[in-house]
């Protein structure tokens, strides 16, 4: 019977073991994913950063005092690389592009810096007595009317401030205005004296634009849209990455965009909002239109002393004169307008397009203003914008001449485009001036009014130089490269396994760099990561302070705007690299491109499978999906690495147990002897204490202490039957033993008693655990059998019910089918018997 019971128990244990093994296999089938760090992933985010310039200034001009100061730029890359980004769609917005704002600020700074050491013309803000200058034109005819040039005399301080003498100078009519309230029409003043500080451009300053390449520092990149019909806003599917832009000439002009880039296929018109007439329309031409400008007459510069160390440079006109003018091919211009009209009609629902002259404003806006050979031309563009287009037919241009000649006027006192309250005096240029430029774009404004009108009127615009820069930077944007990426993988870092300890590290994260100085070394070690990060932040802050100081004192350091940008770009690149390397070091991933961690992947971050992530998503798409959880993942990796560091430290402290040979070291033996003596002493002490307590207890019960030789009764074991001992004695369950003699015997008896006690208690505990396990197994097995029987019963009932239902349905269907067949048969018989019934009826009728 016992053998059968053992076999039944073994069967139960076998079944239980099989079930547990199956459950373990099912649970282990679920793959555990772990966070893996990748360095160098192709991920970027939109950013604003300090760009620096690259230019080949020597190839364009040897003049060291060019206003653009491009000699401070780095040389251009002879082999620029452009990487096409396949399967990438990126959004661009030319109207909200920080590159435009940065270029605008740079050009303003360059102009201000170039004019800063030049002479202020405040002493010339005096009363001028002016008369018209008699000029001979190319027909040898004296011209007095019109007064294009004024000969003005004035009192001026010489090299000695207490001495004044009379001088004269020639001014253009546009540069002087009559003094108000003065009836004498010959009294004038300089036009900007009451509103601006006039600075005379230095004699060696040149305004010839040199192509400037804007470059991104290390850690950043410039994305370029290569869609040939890109309108400046929205998604771009043909994207590439470059380190520098193409060469951009910072041409300061209004109405017409000069010497820029061309559209690759057809003309493109761009506007932030075509329905808003306050928004400028930028027209990007696909073919340039040449404009040739000339100032025919000859000038000779003369210098006037206007104070100690100051000189005012004026002119003398020698020889014949023609009015300054510009020539444009009429056929090319009309063909260009025709293509522009086609694009405008697409936007404005096939309305009649009308081009009209500027509606008024400052001379810079009303005319086409630009710099030609150092002189500032203001050309009347009415002939360019004076036509009506109904479809592709032009009205209003009936002239047969092949050239359009724009009359131009020259100003020497220029309203600075950088801001209000600034003006510049451009010294006269000697000799004849000729310049040839290419019109590559237009700036247009649209009249508002009745939207139901059949006409749309467009006028030349400009004045906001940001639109000039925007026409070249529309296809670029700056992004910050994020080389650190995290993704789930099946790989886990093999580390020293140890339970985490609940240490208050969260509070330590908010300590400052020196906040842990008064803490213990153990508590301070928890803030090492924080201290490293704070240290880098301090370095970055110190560099930023240095840059601000340099920027504020650049006039003393003789640094150009480009020099400041070079320094900023280099510092920024170092900061970016240090930040990434610091994070890799904190995570224990220094020098690794792929670094596994012990952080389990949380499905709440992304519940996509491995195949969906690695086979279907790009790094950019993956980064957008987990962007909200990146900081959490970073903090978990950091905590995991900190715990790993503590585990390794504790492991190293236990490293002396790695070799058993160390156990035989003399120092270890002395330690073993010390421990043995302490144990023996403790046992002896416990023996003495228990003996004293036993004696005291017996004395309290009324017994007197006996000799240690007295036999004491000891309880008989339950496995010993009652009986007579070998030497006789009473028939009870007790036996007497003598107390041991000697020190070693006493120790041995105590150790034996302790071991027996431990053995009995452990055996009892194991028996209890065994009974509990058997009881739970038996109850569990009975419960499983009950549920199995219940499942079989209900399965059988459901089966019988289903069979009965099917039988009933089959019987009902069969009976119904039989009845239908019977009815059909009767109908068919009746139809078949109709002729017979007719015949029988006829026979009866005949009888």
Swiss-Prot record:
Annotated region described as CD4-binding loop, given as residue ranges: 358-368
UniProt region (Immunosuppression), positions on chain: 565-583
Leader peptide range in chain numbering: 1-31
Record region (V4): 379-408
Protein family membership: Belongs to the HIV-1 env protein family.
Record text about domains: Some of the most genetically diverse regions of the viral genome are present in Env. They are called variable regions 1 through 5 (V1 through V5). Coreceptor usage of gp120 is determined mainly by the primary structure of the third variable region (V3) in the outer domain of gp120. The sequence of V3 determines which coreceptor, CCR5 and/or CXCR4 (corresponding to R5/macrophage, X4/T cell and R5X4/T cell and macrophage tropism), is used to trigger the fusion potential of the Env complex, and hence which cells the virus can infect. Binding to CCR5 involves a region adjacent in addition to V3. The membrane proximal external region (MPER) present in gp41 is a tryptophan-rich region recognized by the antibodies 2F5, Z13, and 4E10. MPER seems to play a role in fusion.
Lipidation (S-palmitoyl cysteine): 755, 828
Cytoplasmic face of the membrane: 697-847
V1: region residues: 130-151
Region described as V2: 152-193
Placement of sequence motif YXXL motif: 703-706
Residues annotated as glycosylated: 87, 134, 140, 151, 155, 183-184, 194, 231, 238, 259, 273, 286, 292, 327, 334, 350, 356, 380, 386, 390, 400, 438, 450, 602, 607, 616, 628
Positions in coiled-coil regions: 624-658
BP GO annotations: clathrin-dependent endocytosis of virus by host cell; fusion of virus membrane with host endosome membrane; fusion of virus membrane with host plasma membrane; positive regulation of plasma membrane raft polarization; positive regulation of receptor clustering; viral protein processing; virion attachment to host cell
Name by which UniProt lists this protein: Envelope glycoprotein gp160
S-S bridge residues: 53-73, 118-202, 125-193, 130-152, 215-244, 225-236, 293-326, 372-435, 379-408, 589-595
Description of post-translational modifications: Highly glycosylated by host. The high number of glycan on the protein is reffered to as 'glycan shield' because it contributes to hide protein sequence from adaptive immune system. Palmitoylation of the transmembrane protein and of Env polyprotein (prior to its proteolytic cleavage) is essential for their association with host cell membrane lipid rafts. Palmitoylation is therefore required for envelope trafficking to classical lipid rafts, but not for viral replication.
Note, other: Inhibitors targeting HIV-1 viral envelope proteins are used as antiretroviral drugs. Attachment of virions to the cell surface via non-specific interactions and CD4 binding can be blocked by inhibitors that include cyanovirin-N, cyclotriazadisulfonamide analogs, PRO 2000, TNX 355 and PRO 542. In addition, BMS 806 can block CD4-induced conformational changes. Env interactions with the coreceptor molecules can be targeted by CCR5 antagonists including SCH-D, maraviroc (UK 427857) and aplaviroc (GW 873140), and the CXCR4 antagonist AMD 070.
UniProt source species: Human immunodeficiency virus type 1 group M subtype B (isolate WMJ22)
Keyword list, A-Z: AIDS, Apoptosis, Clathrin-mediated endocytosis of virus by host, Cleavage on pair of basic residues, Coiled coil, Disulfide bond, Fusion of virus membrane with host endosomal membrane, Fusion of virus membrane with host membrane, Glycoprotein, Host cell membrane, Host endosome, Host membrane, Host-virus interaction, Lipoprotein, Membrane, Palmitate, Signal, Transmembrane, Transmembrane helix, Viral attachment to host cell, Viral envelope protein, Viral immunoevasion, Viral penetration into host cytoplasm, Virion, Virus endocytosis by host, Virus entry into host cell
Region of interest: Disordered: 709-731
Region annotation V3: where it falls in the sequence: 293-325
Annotated region described as Fusion peptide, given as residue ranges: 502-523
Highest taxon in the source lineage: Viruses
């Amino acid at each position: 019977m016992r053998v059968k019971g053992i076999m039944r128990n073994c069967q139960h244990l076998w079944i239980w073991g099989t079930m547990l093994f199956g459950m373990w296999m099912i649970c282990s089938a679920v793959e555990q994913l772990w966070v893996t760090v990748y360095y160098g992933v192709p991920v970027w985010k939109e950013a604003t950063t300090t760009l620096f310039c690259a230019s080949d200034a020597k190839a364009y001009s040897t003049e060291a005092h060019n206003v653009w100061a491009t000699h401070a730029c780095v040389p251009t890359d002879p082999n620029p690389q452009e990487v096409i980004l396949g399967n990438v769609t990126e959004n661009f917005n030319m109207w909200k592009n920080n590159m435009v704002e940065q270029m605008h600020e740079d050009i303003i700074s360059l102009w201000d810096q170039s004019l800063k050491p030049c002479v202020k013309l405040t002493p010339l803000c005096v009363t001028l007595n002016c008369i018209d200058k008699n000029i001979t034109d190319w027909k040898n005819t004296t011209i007095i009317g019109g007064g294009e040039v004024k000969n003005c005399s004035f009192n001026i301080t010489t090299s000695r401030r207490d001495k004044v003498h009379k001088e004269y100078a020639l001014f253009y009519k546009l540069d002087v205005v009559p003094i108000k309230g003065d009836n004498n029409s010959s009294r004038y003043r300089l036009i900007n004296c009451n509103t601006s500080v006039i600075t005379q451009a230095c004699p060696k300053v040149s305004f010839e634009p040199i192509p400037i390449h804007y470059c991104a520092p290390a850690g950043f990149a410039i994305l370029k849209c290569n869609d040939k019909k890109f309108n400046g806003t929205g998604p771009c599917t043909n994207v590439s990455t470059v380190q520098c832009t193409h060469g951009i000439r910072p041409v300061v002009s209004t109405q017409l965009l000069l010497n820029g880039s061309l559209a690759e296929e057809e003309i493109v018109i761009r506007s932030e909002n075509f329905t808003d007439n306050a928004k400028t329309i930028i027209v990007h031409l696909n073919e340039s239109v040449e404009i040739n400008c000339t100032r025919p007459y000859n000038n000779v510069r003369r210098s006037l002393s206007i104070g100690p160390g100051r000189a005012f440079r004026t002119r003398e006109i020698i020889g014949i004169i023609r009015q300054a003018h510009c020539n444009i091919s009429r056929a090319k211009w009309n063909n260009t307008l025709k293509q522009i009209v086609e694009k405008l009609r697409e936007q404005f629902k096939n309305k009649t397009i009308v081009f009209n002259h500027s509606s008024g404003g400052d001379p810079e806006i009303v005319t086409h203003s630009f710099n030609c050979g150092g002189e500032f031309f203001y050309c009347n563009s009415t002939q360019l914008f004076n036509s009506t287009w109904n479809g592709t037919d032009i009205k209003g241009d009936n002239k047969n001449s092949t050239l359009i000649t724009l009359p131009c006027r020259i100003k020497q006192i220029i309203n600075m485009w950088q801001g209000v309250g600034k003006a510049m005096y451009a010294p006269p240029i000697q000799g004849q001036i000729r310049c040839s430029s290419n019109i590559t774009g237009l700036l247009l404004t649209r009249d508002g009014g009745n939207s139901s009108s059949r006409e749309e009127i467009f006028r030349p615009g400009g004045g906001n130089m940001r639109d000039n820069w925007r026409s070249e930077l529309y296809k670029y944007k700056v992004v910050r490269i994020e080389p650190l990426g995290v993704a789930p993988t099946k790989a886990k870092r093999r580390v020293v396994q140890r339970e985490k300890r609940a240490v208050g590290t969260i509070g330590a994260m908010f300590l400052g760099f020196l906040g842990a100085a008064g803490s213990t070394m153990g508590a301070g070690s928890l803030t090492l990561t924080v201290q490293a990060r704070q240290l880098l932040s301090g370095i970055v802050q110190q560099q930023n302070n240095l840059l601000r100081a340099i920027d504020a004192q650049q006039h003393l350091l003789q640094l150009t705007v480009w020099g400041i940008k070079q320094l900023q770009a280099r510092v920024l690149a170092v900061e970016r690299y240090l930040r990434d390397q610091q994070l890799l070091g904190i995570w224990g991933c220094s020098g690794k491109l792929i670094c596994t961690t012990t952080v389990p992947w949380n499905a709440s971050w992304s519940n996509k499978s491995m195949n969906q992530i690695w086979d279907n998503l790009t790094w950019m798409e993956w980064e957008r999906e987990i962007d909200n959880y990146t900081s959490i993942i970073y903090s978990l990796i950091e905590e995991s690495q900190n715990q790993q560091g503590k585990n390794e430290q504790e492991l190293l402290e236990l490293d002396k147990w790695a070799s058993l040979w160390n156990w035989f070291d003399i120092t270890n033996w002395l330690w073993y002897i010390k421990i043995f003596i302490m144990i023996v002493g403790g046992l002896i002490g416990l023996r003495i204490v228990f003996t004293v307590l036993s004696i005291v207890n017996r004395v309290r019960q009324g017994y007197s202490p006996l000799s240690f030789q007295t036999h004491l009764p000891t309880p008989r074991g339950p496995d010993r039957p009652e009986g007579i001992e070998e030497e006789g004695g009473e028939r009870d369950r007790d036996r007497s033993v003598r107390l041991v003699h000697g020190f070693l015997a006493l120790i041995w008896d105590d150790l034996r008693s302790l071991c027996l006690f431990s053995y009995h208690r452990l055996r009892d505990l194991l028996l209890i655990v065994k009974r509990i396990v058997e009881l739970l197994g038996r109850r569990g097995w009975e419960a499983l059998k009950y549920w199995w029987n219940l499942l079989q019963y209900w399965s059988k009932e459901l089966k019988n019910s289903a069979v009965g239902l099917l039988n009933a349905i089959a019987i009902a269907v069969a009976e119904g089918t039989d009845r239908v067949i019977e009815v059909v048969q009767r109908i068919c018989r009746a139809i078949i018997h109709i002729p017979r019934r007719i015949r029988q009826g006829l026979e009866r009728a005949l009888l």
